Amino acid sequence: MDVPSSSNVTGRRKRQVLDDDEDDGFRSTPLRKVRGTKKIRPADVVPETIMTKIGAHIDDIVNKKKVGELNCFEYKSPLEIHTIEDMIKAKASIQEMAVVLEGAQCIIGYRVDRLHHDVRQIDSALSSGTVMRDSNGEEIHLTLESRKAKKKMAVVDGMNGMLDFLNNMDDALTTTELDADNDKNWKEDEENIAGEPRIDFKANSKDVDAFLQRDIFPEKLIYALSIKRATDLRADLLSDVSNYISADDTAHDLKDANIDWLRANPTFQKATKGSVCNSSNSFHSLNYYGIHSPDGRTLMLHNRIADKNADDRFFTSDVSVSLVKNTRALLTNSLDKKPRILDNYLMLEVKDRPVIGRYKIMSKDVKKSTLPLAESSREKDLANLTFAEMNHRPSNLDMTVAGASDMSMLPGNQGLPLAQGENDETIALDRLTPPLQSSVSQKASDEYVLPPLEANDLDEHLIGKLPIEPNEMDQTLANMFDKKLEVFNTSDTLESKVWKNGIRAEEWGEDDEAIMKNDTKHPRQAGIEGWIKATDAWTNYDVVKMNVNREARSQLDENAIDEQESYRNMVPEIGKNLFLVKSDDYMNNYPGDRPADFTVNDEVSDVMKMWSGEDSTAEDDVPLEQIQQEIREQVQQQDVDMEPIEEMDYDAGGAAFDVDFDDRLAAPVEVEEMEGDNNRNDGRVADILFNEQMDETEVEERNEQDVQRELEDIALAADEVAELMTSAPPPQLVGPSAEMREEIQNIGKNDNAHWVPPVVGDQERQAAVTAQRKRREKKAKSRKATVEDFVHYFRDIPDDEIEREITAAKCSKIADEKSTFLSEQQLYLPTLGIENKPHVAFEMGLLGNSGMFFKKSYGKIRLERVKNQKAEQDLFIDEARGNKDSDCLNWLLSFSGFRCMENPEPITGSDSDENLRTAVEQPFDDDFANDYYDEDRYDPNYEQQLAAAQMGPDMQRKLALTASHINQMFPNIHSKRYGGEYGDSDDEFDDSFDRQSIQAKNLDAAKHKKCLAEILKTDSLSMPSIQYVLEQLTSNQTLRMNNTTIRAADDRNETGRPATPTMEADKTLTSVFDYRSPNKSNHDVNETMKALTEMPDYQAADERPNNQPTTSTYGTANTENRKVHINGCHTLLSLALSMPSRMGETVRPSSIVSFLLHIANENNLQIVQDRSKRSWMSDFIVLNSSESLPRGLKMGRIEDQDEFWKRTQDPDAIEGTASDANNVFSNLMRRPKAVPVRKGRGAGGQPTTSDLGAIVEEEEMEE
């Protein structure tokens, strides 16, 4: 009995505990302090045995997930800590052994994955140009620098360095093999006694890795395998090196979580957005199909340099006699009617990688503890559940290394005894008869005699009979595995995996790549390429019209039948047909690569060296200026060498006829004239139209190189997509070329260009009448062109076009400009009439199945023809200047449908109309404008200035007043506070060409889209709510009624503000849309102002794992806002008012339009414009899908503006002329001019022209 302590005054007794100096193995477990005494029981003292140490180690590996690919070689395998013999002596149970094997499998799985990853990093490191080894040459792994490292090496130097590195590895391999042979010979001489090998009693104690090769540690094995793979790869590099490997560092610039597989997929070398821009965000539709070519414009898909060993699923060295015997013994027992109970028999269960195998502990499932194999054998083939088979399934390619002797690792004394012979490691079922307690005490060195073969007969229908001879056994088992693999490959599971997430991220199988190519071939050709070709053709081609009657149609049908084996020629329909002809004057204006992108880390790279190919003899000391001069001379020489194409001899066939087609788009003509056959006397069109010889009458063949050059200049590349992106802008010339200066001077004269003033339109109509009279006289003297003359247009269609036509149901309906016949409605806006023909207008809904805009069509977009800037190829790095519009957005903004006034800046000063009139500079005369554009410098934003200037003075005053109110409401929200969107600019137009350096900043797409989505979901930020607040602030009632803390205007402006809402204030947000809420009491000023001034903290919803890339802390750009439901009536102007304050930074209207189109595309939203107003392009409404217009919204009729459109000859033009273009716009926008203002410009007020005054009066009367 314990004696109470004398110091225990409370009567409590101390507990007796063991001293701290005692051995750890006898230390007691922690106990609760309770009253009274308690004796220590033997069960409380648990010594730390071998199995507890191993269990803790396995718990770190399996459950706590402390082991991964990075540290898998630092953690020891459980079998490396203690041998199986030690575990047997510690009386380990079969359950504990199962856990040990599971931990060993997990470690091996990570090591194999790390091995494959390191080997495949060899060729992926080629693109970065840097490959290094550890300072210690004996280290196993390669050290690969980050792909975002600086570029210090050209591609050729990187290739040579890589080959040298592999050669050194080959030398190390030879040395290792020689040393291994010497050690082996010495050991065999020592161990062989009387010609017989000595039995190794500890053969089973090594890690599973070691059973592939005896007497080799796992580290050496992994190193040897790496050397072997690298040697094979070196041979592939010498023979199959890709021509499209480039050294840029944008290989993994992917922003969509749905295509994360592309970052580490072993079948692609790299994937970029189609441009060598290092600072731009990419869009996944451009990245899906592969890498970019050296010129940066063409996305090309090609196979990665294949690791041939990656597809090896079966190693013959893994098949041994003991493995065959173990398999036979397990199958025999499991198929027996009364199988012997193998306590807690473990079945391999494949889980998610990188865990190769996981042993299922049957004892934890009481209901299935009896006869686990006998029950399952009645349902499915057990051959697929064997250890060997599970290690050779195609879905687990990395298991081959560990698949040699999994069964031989089972303990020999726990129901599965193993023989101790070096080549005989079989399971003896007869030895299961003794109870398990007696089997524990058996020695590991007991001899085992294989029972008679008759006792182990296998079910023939399962795997067939296995012969006794070892060689025949190996061959039979190999055939069995091959059959199982063939069945797996021919099943439907493979195809379903390919398209589960675009492409599965696991290791590719043998046929996966071919299946992917076959499935993506048709959508890629018919969808993307067709969309690009059709868009380019509809925008920039000339239109040729031809009537086809029944006789001509039947003749064409007969010709098609007489052609080759099948009806392969496409013929037009009966009636009027329109064809697109390539134009020499108007070509696609999609920007090419920007030379500034070749500047990395403020260091100009040598462009010639970067794409020098495989020629490693190029000089490294050639200055950049010399290379640029050589390029200029070559381009000039090519222009000189190009001989003009002579007109075709139409009289060669014996019959004289003229084809009278205009070289450019024809001027407006009468309707009856359009009904006839258009002819053309320019023979070059025949060659462009037919793309081949016409009746073999052309005198001289064109140079093939020149033809190829023209094709590259005309069309968009195959995989370039007109997608909205957020990247850097295209380069623009510092000064205009001769062609561009001539075009600027002759705007509205030579062609039916955009923004044609009424005066010029009258002159053009008069010229058109004269041209029509001349054409009639010429037609009367010549024979008209017939369908037979165009027979070469309906050529024999190549196979790739047939494939596109076959897959039309799955892909786009538009495949090729020469296999697509357009209707008149597709080319011309039906509301205008033929006489007021725009260049091209088409319905975006026709492209709905092309794969790009598959969720939402944005209505009609009118495309504008822009003359090709042939001097683009002369731009170099020192001439490039900053421009913050993105590539594709800039391309879309060149179309008039997206051309509107952006980012209006406030005009400070009095709000009265008289002061506003004096603050606006008066326009200058036309004569001065013509002289002004003769200078070497010009305004690159002339057309956008003209668009805003033609809004009219009344509209300008309204917008200026609104801007001043907004500036007074939010005095702290100014672009200077946030430093501008790009850090050094207060205005989006502050990108003058005379600025020396502008650092572009990537827009956070996810943040913008999330902010837009929240605004759209908030009714208090809708257009009526903001309009109501503006009205209250204007009448100065809000400060008195609600006692808000909004900062009031200055005293000098407060006196001039009217006491009641003015007409201009009412029109601030309703200049285009006339909307009045039925009940204004629903609008709360405090709530709206709080929402306007609130700056939410956009944080990520959940943390992403390290292996998943993300473009932003706010989520991914394309998956963040998939579900957006609009509350309220939101317009572009209301969004432009709300976003800057909530974002805490300057937001450009062009960015709002870009991201809003993305959200509309993802959520099937509507974008509505009121074209009855002349300023309809300055605003639009965003509505939910299938949602009707708001009740208080009044929409006009476009017919009310018919007279105005006819006078301007352009559906998108806005009132005004070119005479009041630049000064009004620059004052309204408050931006620095790109061109210095000449003295005297706007000094004297010029009266408005009579035509402009008439239009202004007409608008005032309407409103």
UniProtKB/Swiss-Prot annotation:
Disruption of the gene: reported phenotype: Results in larval lethality in XX hermaphrodites; survivors exhibit shorter and stouter body morphology and are egg-laying defective. Male animals are viable. Higher percentage of spontaneous males through X chromosome non-disjunction. Disrupts protein stability of dpy-27. Disrupts localization of dpy-28 and of capg-1 to the hermaphrodite X-chromosome. RNAi-mediated knockdown results in chromosome segregation defects in mitosis and meiosis. In a sex-1 mutant background, leads to high embryonic lethality.
Coiled-coil annotated spans: 691-725
Comp. bias (Polar residues): 1-10, 1106-1118
GO cellular component, one term: dosage compensation complex
Tissue expression from the record: Expressed in embryos and in somatic and germline tissues in L4 stage larvae (at protein level).
GO term, biological process aspect, one: meiotic sister chromatid segregation
Keyword set, alphabetical order: Cell cycle, Cell division, Chromosome, Coiled coil, DNA condensation, Meiosis, Mitosis, Nucleus
Region (Disordered): 1-29, 1098-1118, 1225-1263
Location(s) in or outside the cell: Nucleus; Chromosome
Tree of life domain: Eukaryota
Basic residues bias (residue ranges): 1230-1241
The protein's assembly and partners: Component of the condensin I complex, which contains the mix-1/SMC2 and smc-4/SMC4 heterodimer, and three non SMC subunits that probably regulate the complex: dpy-26, capg-1 and dpy-28. Within the complex, interacts with dpy-28, mix-1, smc-4 and capg-1. Component of the dosage compensation complex, which consists of the condensin I-like components mix-1/SMC2 and dpy-27/SMC4, and the three non SMC subunits dpy-26, capg-1 and dpy-28. Within the complex, interacts with dpy-27, dpy-28, mix-1 and capg-1. The interaction with dpy-27 is required for dpy-27 protein stability. Interacts with smcl-1.
Functional description taken from the UniProt entry: Required for both chromosome condensation and segregation and for X-chromosome dosage compensation depending on its binding partners. Member of the condensin I complex, a complex required for conversion of interphase chromatin into mitotic-like condense chromosomes and for proper chromosome segregation in mitosis and meiosis. As a member of the condensin I complex, further controls the crossover number and distribution in meiosis by restricting double strand break formation, probably by influencing higher-order chromosome structure.
Name of the protein: Condensin complex subunit dpy-26
Organism of derivation: Caenorhabditis elegans
Taxon lineage: Eukaryota, Metazoa, Ecdysozoa, Nematoda, Chromadorea
Gene: dpy-26
